[in-house]
Each structure stands twice: as structure tokens, then as C-alpha cells.
Design a protein with these regions (language model features):
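A post-motif C-terminal structural segment
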Residues: 21-37, 47-52, 62-68, 72-115, ...
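C-terminal GPI-anchoring signal of eukaryotic secretory precursors
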Residues: 492-509
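Cleavable N-terminal signal peptides of Sec/SRP-targeted secreted and luminal proteins
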Residues: 1-15, 507-520
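Outer membrane beta-barrel
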Residues: 161-170
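Substrate-binding/charge-relay-adjacent region of secreted/lumenal peptidase catalytic domains
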Residues: 104, 108, 119-128
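His/Cys-centered metal/cofactor-coordination and adjacent catalytic loops
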Residues: 129-144
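Structural beta-sheet core signal
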Residues: 56-57, 163, 372
């Protein structure tokens, strides 16, 4: 409101900053830097162990500005000014950048990028699990151009595998882990054109249960795509938009349940069932007909948080002595940005960071490689010379020198937040900019905000995490993970690599022992 804004202006002019007294002393910063340097020097001893477990946290749309803003929000939620806060991903020792473009797009979409960081090859926008030789919507270009994912490589190596997402389980990001489709929007056969069905292309929901039939953990939304058309939803009976969509009449959930009886598999559709079930060997949890709600709108009694899903997933997957691969997507960061709802997006990012922290408590860097990255960025940013501790959702402490009006610190390059009132820019000082659904100001009017094209950060820790350095193509990521775990096409080096996975030291010892024994004889 106007009073709050006036107070900000006054405090700014008084050169007020909510820093502590110790920050005025150079010793504070020197001590902090020396401590950081000491920690950095320990990284000279590289972790060359074999990665028994692999975890990929994917923040959909979580560009670097989103990471920074989420860091500030996390601190402010804990009563701090925010800038000095550390996200869990900030603690990872190795950081690199990934170039996100698709083969046919400078600014990418989530399907082509998912194919890159899961399957190891760049692809066209809108396609999943196929090479760039496949053309979007053209079914006849798919056959023979399928590519497999690291989830498949891990499964073939005897590891347990899982997918956890806050979107539909057949959405762009998770689908690239198991599906091959020339259109990311073919969620069920209801969304597919007749000629594609005739040519033998399969919908993505069907592929979830058929292509890799023994995925150990499946959690997210997308329930309606698994049931016959017009079948009433178990949670929202009688609500047409939540009813089943499948034209083929198949009940994929029932088929999965029948197939998993011998494995004692559990199908769950609400939080209570998830939390209180005994830890099964296999689980499929579909908690909403479509995407899960934003964390700020989530009913904590019925829908699990991303952190809760990750905890259950790891409890199940770690029972396999050969290890596991887990894909975790904070998928609704992207949705919040598209809608211009920065508060929704940033709270989603903070929740994903909580999930990263929970996974860290349940695993060890000795044998678990964890990577945190994004598929792409957004045209989201914040600025305006805000003072230290300024609420991340607040106003900049200055008026525009063009129209003499306030503006929000958070700004989108385009999107639905572009608003005119009587032909002039909206006076945001009279608007409740802190409500959850507030659409932050945008420079160009669009019904949906767009992706950004800049590089995204890749945070890594665990065995061979140092291989993620510098600037790389996005498709490099699964190759590093596979190399660390000795799966897929990266196996030969495992016989000679030093560390717990390397067998050369062991073989050398055996040869030496045999030589000594022969001499003694």
C-alpha cells in the first residue's frame, strides 16, 4: 500500500539496510572468504567412486534469476533479509552451465530439452524420446528414430528406477524418460489425430506402462489419462473435466495393478494412502486428474508435497542393493511463470529445494550422484535498485522517471501482467501485489509468458561430479551420470578407474600376491 511504499522511500534515503553490525567489519567478510577457501581446497581430493545411485532434480523453468529469487524468498520465509541465505543446491561443490537450445529452436521447449538431459541427444521442440530426424506431429517420421533414456539404461543395469513430478506423469519432462512421441501433447489417445493412431503411434500414458513395464516408482498427476472416457474420477465424482479421457476404453491403472500383484505393488491416489502404506517394492501414485496444485494452494490433507513424495520414493528405491535412478521434477515452477504468477513459481522452487534437502539426508555423497538443473529459463527477472532485505515480491524503491509511477521489483519481459488502465500503465502502488495470484508486471502483452533462451545452471555433487564443469551442451548431462554409474554405453572404464569402483588396484594386488607366492615356492 501507499504507506508501506512511503516507508521504503524514507528508509532508503536514510541509507538504511538490515545488515548486521558485523557486516560493517572487513574481518567478517575475510573470515567468511577464508572459510569458503578452506572448504574449496578439500575438493582437490576428487570423489572417483562408482555412483550406486543417481538423482536428477529438474526445476522446470528454473533459470538463474529464479534460483536467486528463490534463495531470497527462502531466507525471508525464515525471517532473514534473504540475500545471504543458502539454498540446498547452493551447497553443491560443482557448478556448470548448460546450453538449452533445441535442434530447431533458439529458445527451447520442455520436450526437446527433456530428450537432451534424459536421452543424451538434442531434439526438435515438442518431441520426446526421438532424435531430431523425427518431425513434430508427423507419426511416420518417428519409427526408427527412437532414442532411449538414462532411466532405461539404469533399469537394464538392474537398478530400481523412479519418476516423481508435480505435473502430469505424462507431461513433457517425465515422458522423455520412457516414451517416444512426435508430439508432447498426445497425453492419451483422445488427444491424438486418427492418422497417427492408424500409423501405429501410441499415446504417452499408454507408453508409461508398456515401454518400461517395471518402473518401480511413479508419482505425480495425470489420473484422467489412464481411465476410459467419461469414467468418473475417484476424487471428483461427477466433474466432467476430471473424468477419464481414453477412447480405447482401457483402464491402465487396473492393468498395472493386475500386473503388479506378484510384486505387491501399490496404487495410491491421496496423501493418506501414500504416507501410511507399508513401504512396497513398487508404487504408482496419481494424486490429481491433471497437474498437482501449486504448493501455495495444495490441500495438505489430500495431496502430498514434492518433499513427501521424494522421501517415500527413496525409501522404496534404496531397497535395491544395486542402487537406483530417480528423476524428480519441480514442474509447476514453469506453470507459475507462464501465468505471470511469480509468487506461485518461487514457492514451487523453494519446495523443490526442500525436497533436495530431504534427499540429501537420505543418501550419501560417497555413492550417490545428485544433479540439480533446469530444462530452460523464463523471461523473468528482478531489479530496480531494491534495498537489502526488500521483499522479493515488493516494489522497487523509486518511481519511473517517465510516467512517475511505481513498479514491481519482479518484471517479466512478456506475459499477462501487462496492464493498461485508461490507456496508461497501471498504478501498482494501489494494487495488492502480495496476493498469491498476482500477475507481476510485464513489458509486452501476451496471454502466456514465454521461455527464456539463456544457459541454465547445473549443480552437481557425489561421485565424478567434477565432470560437470564449464559450459556444455545440455545433452552432456546423462552421459556424465551414466559414466559415473557405469551404465549404458559407459562401462569399460569401470574396470580400471581408481576409487571404490576401480578394479585395477585389486587386480594388481592379486597379481603381486601370486608373484610373491611363486617366488617363495
Amino acid at each position: 500500500n501507499d504507506l508501506t511504499y512511503l516507508l521504503i522511500i524514507i528508509l532508503t534515503r536514510l541509507d538504511y539496510f538490515p545488515y548486521t553490525e558485523q557486516e560493517k567489519d572487513p574481518k567478517f567478510w575475510n573470515k567468511w572468504a577464508q572459510r569458503t577457501l578452506t572448504n574449496a581446497l578439500t575438493l582437490q581430493s576428487l570423489n572417483k567412486n562408482e555412483a550406486k545411485n543417481l538423482i536428477l532434480f529438474l526445476g522446470d523453468g528454473m533459470g538463474v534469476p529464479t534460483v536467486t529469487a528463490a534463495r531470497i524468498l527462502k531466507g525471508q520465509l525464515n525471517g532473514q533479509s534473504g540475500e545471504e541465505t543458502q539454498l540446498e543446491m547452493d551447497k553443491f561443490p560443482f557448478v556448470s552451465l548448460a546450453k538449452t537450445y533445441n535442434t530447431n529452436a533458439q529458445v527451447p521447449d520442455s520436450a526437446g530439452t527433456a530428450t537432451a538431459y534424459l536421452c543424451g541427444v538434442k531434439a526438435n521442440e515438442g518431441t520426446v524420446g526421438v532424435s531430431a530426424a523425427a518431425v513434430r506431429t508427423q507419426c511416420n517420421t518417428m519409427h526408427g528414430n527412437e532414442v532411449t533414456s538414462i532411466l532405461r539404461w539404469a533399469k537394464d543395469a538392474g537398478k530400481s528406477v523412479g519418476i516423481v513430478t508435480t505435473t502430469r506423469v505424462n507431461h513433457a519432462t517425465p515422458s522423455a524418460a520412457y516414451a517416444h512421441s512426435v508430439d508432447r501433447d498426445w497425453y492419451s489417445d483422445n488427444e491424438m489425430p486418427a492418422d497417427a493412431l492408424k500409423d501405429g503411434c501410441k499415446d504417452i500414458a499408454r507408453q508409461l506402462f508398456e515401454n518400461i513395464p517395471n518402473i518401480d516408482v511413479i508419482m505425480g498427476g495425470g489420473r484422467k489419462y489412464m481411465f476410459p472416457k467419461n469414467k468418473s474420477d475417484v476424487e471428483y465424482p461427477g466433474v466432467a473435466k476430471h473424468s477419464g479421457t481414453r477412447k480405447d476404453g482401457r483402464n491402465l491403472v487396473q492393468e498395472w495393478t493386475d500386473r503388479m500383484k506378484d510384486k505387491k505393488g501399490y496404487y495410491v491416489w491421496n496423501k493418506k494412502q501414500l504416507i501410511f502404506c507399508t513401504v512396497p517394492s513398487v508404487i504408482s501414485g496419481l494424486f490429481e486428474p491433471a497437474d498437482l496444485p501449486y504448493d501455495l494452494e495444495r490441500n495438505s490433507e489430500t495431496d502430498p508435497s514434492l518433499t513427501e513424495m521424494v522421501e517415500v520414493a527413496i525409501k522404496i528405491l534404496r531397497k535395491n542393493h544395486r542402487g537406483f535412478y530417480l528423476l524428480v521434477e519441480g514442474g509447476r515452477i514453469d506453470h507459475g511463470h507462464h501465468e505471470g504468477k511469480a509468487k506461485m513459481a518461487l514457492h514451487e522452487a523453494v519446495e523443490m529445494d526442500r525436497a533436495i534437502g530431504r534427499a540429501d539426508l537420505m543418501t550419501s555423497t560417497h555413492d550417490t550422484m545428485t544433479i540439480v538443473t533446469a530444462d530452460h529459463s523464463h523471461v523473468f527477472n528482478f531489479g530496480g535498485y531494491t534495498v537489502r532485505g526488500n521483499t522479493i515480491f515488493g516494489l522497487a524503491p523509486m518511481l519511473s522517471d517517465v510516467d512517475q509511477k511505481s513498479f514491481t521489483a519482479i518484471i517479466y519481459g512478456n506475459g499477462p501482467g501487462y496492464k493498461l488502465v485508461n490507456g496508461a500503465r497501471e498504478n501498482v502502488s494501489t494494487v495488492d501485489i502480495h496476493k498469491n495470484n498476482y500477475q507481476a508486471q510485464a513489458a509486452v502483452p501476451l496471454s502466456m509468458e514465454t521461455h527464456g533462451g539463456e544457459d541454465v545452471a547445473v549443480f552437481a555433487k557425489g561421485p565424478l561430479a567434477h565432470l560437470l564443469h564449464g559450459v556444455h551442451e545440455q545433452n552432456y548431462i546423462p552421459h556424465v551420470m551414466a559414466y559415473a554409474a557405469c551404465i549404458g554405453q559407459n562401462k569399460e572404464h569401470c574396470m580400471s578407474r581408481s576409487g571404490s569402483a576401480g578394479l585395477r588396484p585389486v587386480l594388481s594386488s592379486i597379481v603381486a600376491l601370486l608373484t610373491v607366492t611363486r617366488l617363495l615356492c
